[in-house]
UniProtKB/Swiss-Prot annotation:
Upper taxonomic lineage: Bacteria, Pseudomonadati, Spirochaetota, Spirochaetia, Spirochaetales
Organism: Borreliella burgdorferi (strain ATCC 35210 / DSM 4680 / CIP 102532 / B31)
Protein name, entry field: Flagellar hook protein FlgE
Gene that specifies this protein: flgE
Pfam families: Flg_bb_rod, Flg_bbr_C, FlgE_D2, LlgE_F_G_D1
Compartmental location: Bacterial flagellum basal body
Effect on the protein upon substituting residue 192 to S: In strain: HB19
Gene Ontology terms describing biological process: bacterial-type flagellum-dependent swarming motility
Length: 442
């Protein structure tokens, strides 16, 4: 039999394989997180008719004579280039801008994917709803009253506790960073109510006790009649006078003294106020609560009460307490941190999504569901947080589309078709030659 017959057969078989890969790419053009394949060919071993000879004094050298025996598939590569993002506006839809993979777990087995169409199941786990695999990361833990995420610990299932309660927290500090208008008029003795109102800076702030009950702090500040740059302040709690103090400023509008005691530059001026809160039962007087009024830093303009010839402000006043609330929603930032949003306005870090990378992502094996698994040639998985070692950032509200270029695939399809036709022609022509040989006998 002629070698060209078998060369043509190998060409047909392997061009069919290439067509299978092209067809799979086109079929998955709209598959979220899909990575296209590419077929590379190589020639097979060649049969030597004669070897090479070296040159002599009388005659030059000759090259080897070899006849090829066809071709085969050298590799079928998975191309892990970045796909374009499609906006969905859904918080749990995620895409990776970089080289990282999301980590999924089923039982004890880990899978890796770029398809980030996730959701929260009835057990409040963050999962891939197509197969129920759970997304891996790190949950936040309570440490001295703060939520801390330890990314050095082992990865675990991520839980988003929609509907969970956040208990009330009593107010410990009220921080002021507002401005007192230096142009406010002095309030003379015997002034009428209108003049008193024009010359008084008043601000109200809600304070919380450990039950979530609200008390109203009212601060009234007026210019001192006798001393420039000095202001007299009165604190009222729930409409009842609580305490008094004075604030002094330097000639550049920065806070300088409290109750006549000048501070050094950088000193924090603060004053405690104490009042009774409601008890556990209706009408019962509870324990005393102390709240620290942080009035500012001596010599600072950014985190202190100031005195400038500009409108008095009331917005830059912050207190650290809150009432009871329920988790209503969540969002995921570009660092992969899941942030719970509560009905009382509090935001809590719930956990962080982990990403995986490999020395050779092309060595990963496809396992279905747009997932990959580790192989001996992918290298061991390296798990980390976003922004490290090329893992990239996480985008919320988007999905990564397939990296299939239809123009490229249609071109490959045409080239593959012509290659298949050419190899088929090799077989038919070889058959015609064999027929001629058979006819020689007749």
């Amino acid at each position: 039999m002629m070698r060209s017959l078998y060369s043509g057969v190998s060409g047909l078989q392997n061009h069919q394989t290439r067509m299978d890969v092209v067809g799979n790419n086109i079929a998955n053009v709209n598959t979220i997180g899909f990575k296209k394949g590419r077929v590379n060919f190589q020639d097979m071993i060649s049969q030597s008719i004669s070897g090479a000879s070296r040159p002599t004094d009388a005659r030059g050298g000759t090259n080897p004579k070899q006849v090829g025996l066809g071709m085969n598939v050298a590799s079928i590569d998975t191309i892990h280039t970045q796909g374009a993002f499609q906006s969905t506006q859904k918080a749990s839809d995620l895409g990776v801008s970089g080289n990282g993979f999301f980590i999924l777990k089923e039982g004890k087995n880990l899978f890796y994917t770029r398809a980030g169409a996730f959701d929260v199941d009835s057990d409040r786990h963050l999962v891939n709803p197509a197969n129920g695999m759970r997304i891996q990361g790190w949950m936040a833990r309570d440490l001295e009253g703060e939520k801390v995420i330890n990314t050095a610990s082992d990865i675990e299932d991520l839980i988003i506790p929609i509907g969970d309660k956040e208990g009330a927290k009593s107010t410990k500090n009220v921080t002021f960073a507002c401005n007192l208008d230096k142009r406010l008029p002095l309030i003379q003795e015997g002034a009428n109510p209108a003049d008193i109102a024009r010359g008084t800076w008043v601000v109200n702030k809600s304070l919380y006790d450990s039950f979530g009950n609200v008390s109203v702090l009212e601060l009234r500040v007026v210019k001192d009649l006798n001393t420039p740059n000095l202001w007299n302040a009165t604190v009222l709690i729930n409409g009842e006078q609580n305490s008094n103090f004075t604030l002094g400023f330097d000639n550049e509008g920065a806070l300088a003294s409290l109750n006549g005691q000048p501070g050094q530059k950088g000193d924090i001026l603060q004053i405690p106020i104490t009042f009774n809160v409601l008890g556990a039962n209706v009408g019962e007087v509870g324990e005393q609560q102390t709240v620290n009024l942080k009035l500012g830093t001596v010599g600072s303009y950014t985190d202190s009460i100031t005195q400038f010839a500009d409108s008095s402000s009331t917005k830059a006043i912050i207190q650290d307490g809150y009432g009871m609330g329920y988790m209503e929603n969540y969002e995921i930032d570009q660092n992969g941190v899941i942030v719970g949003i509560y009905s009382n306005g509090i935001r809590r870090d719930l956990g962080k999504i982990a990403l995986a990378s490999f020395m050779n992502p092309g060595g990963l094996a496809k396992s279905g569901d747009t997932n990959f698994v580790e192989t001996s040639n992918s290298g061991q998985v390296r798990i980390g947080e976003t922004g490290l070692a090329g893992l990239g950032d996480i985008r919320s509200g988007v999905l990564e589309m397939a990296n299939v270029d239809l123009a490229e695939q249609f071109t490959d399809m045409i080239v593959t078709q012509r290659g298949f036709q050419a190899n088929a022609k090799t077989i038919t022509t070889s058959d015609q030659l064999l027929q001629e040989l058979v006819r020689l006998k007749n």
